[in-house]
Amino acid sequence: MHLAYPAVLSALLFSTGLYGVLARRNAILVLMSVELMLNAVNLNLVAFDVWLSKTARDTLHSGQALTLFTIAIAAAEIGIGLAIVLAVYRNRGTSDIDKLRDTAEGPEPDGPGTDGSAPTAAEKAEATA
């Protein structure tokens, strides 16, 4: 197999993840997009490791070992990220990134909502969508 196929697929996956990070407003979807970008990097690491091991006689599989390490770090990152998003959602009532720009600690002067009211059911449904 040519090196171009996994490299193009990796570039497409990374571009899709980058679009998701830049365009999405929901924090969970942003985390999913970051994971997609990490998987694109992992695919690239394995593809180049296999391609380079064809030319080298003594192969160390360092790209595959680095990929396993990256997968373990990504699993920890997504667990911590989801825990943070869940805690923010419980405290603020939304996971919309634009509404969470001002996350200062302490009581808000206007109350929990932007207009002094509690978050509505539609805002909570939007945060989970």
Curated annotation (Swiss-Prot):
Topological category with respect to the lipid bilayer: Multi-pass membrane protein
Biased composition (Low complexity): 111-122
Localization per Swiss-Prot or TrEMBL: Cell membrane
InterPro entries associated with the record: NADH_UbQ_OxRdtase_chain4L/K, NUOK/Mnh_C1-like
Region of interest (Disordered), residue spans: 98-129
Pfam families (alphabetical): Oxidored_q2
Class of the enzyme per the UniProt entry, highest EC level: translocase
EC numbers for this chain: 7.1.1.-
GO molecular function, one term: quinone binding
Domain of life: Bacteria
GO CC aspect terms: NADH dehydrogenase complex; plasma membrane
One Gene Ontology term from the biological process aspect of the record: ATP synthesis coupled electron transport
Swiss-Prot/TrEMBL keywords: Cell membrane, Membrane, NAD, Quinone, Translocase, Transmembrane, Transmembrane helix, Transport
Catalytic activity reported: a quinone + NADH + 5 H(+)(in) = a quinol + NAD(+) + 4 H(+)(out)
Keyword rRNA-binding: no
Segments crossing the lipid bilayer: 3-23, 28-48, 68-88
NCBIfam families on file: PRK05715.1-2 (NF004320)
Subunit text: NDH-1 is composed of 14 different subunits. Subunits NuoA, H, J, K, L, M, N constitute the membrane sector of the complex.
Biological role stated in the UniProt entry: NDH-1 shuttles electrons from NADH, via FMN and iron-sulfur (Fe-S) centers, to quinones in the respiratory chain. The immediate electron acceptor for the enzyme in this species is believed to be a menaquinone. Couples the redox reaction to proton translocation (for every two electrons transferred, four hydrogen ions are translocated across the cytoplasmic membrane), and thus conserves the redox energy in a proton gradient.
Similarity annotation: Belongs to the complex I subunit 4L family.
Name used for this protein in its record: NADH-quinone oxidoreductase subunit K 2
The organism of origin for this protein: Streptomyces avermitilis (strain ATCC 31267 / DSM 46492 / JCM 5070 / NBRC 14893 / NCIMB 12804 / NRRL 8165 / MA-4680)
Highest classification ranks of the organism: Bacteria, Bacillati, Actinomycetota, Actinomycetes, Kitasatosporales
The encoding gene: nuoK2
